[in-house]
Amino acid sequence: MKFSDNLKAFLDMIAYSEIGTELLKVSDNGYDVIVGSTPQNPILFTNYSEHPRKYQAAQNSDAAGRYQFMGRYWIPYKRQLSLPDFGHESQDIWAVQLIRECRALDLIEKGKFDAAVTACKSRWASLPGAGYGQHENKIEPLRQAYINAGGVVA
């Protein structure tokens, strides 16, 4: 699937926010990361046929992949989007669907970065203002990650 430069940069920003630069480097660009991973102790999966659903008690989560998807949502989105597997393209398509549900695609295309992040905060706990009680990143480094990935801010 082909994505605009702004959308690709926004996806990269989400991965940066959820996983971090160092963990992206020691993994398959985040696509194989299980929640609870650190750059020093990456917890990775190798079978992309399905969401791995590896529960990590310390995080009370089974989030996995580049965009840290929860396992309980895998089957509904797999069916809705006709995803063949949990591979790179499927994860990207699923993330774009979440962005679409947040009504942020147009904001991203228009370069309204801050508004797009705010619109998506309900889907990703690491975004500012998400309110899940987890670490939330500040908007400035996320904006810089987006720009570094080729995104344009209006």
Labelled PLM ranges:
Residues M1-P84, I93-A154:
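Cell-wall polysaccharide-cleaving catalytic domain and substrate-binding groove, primarily
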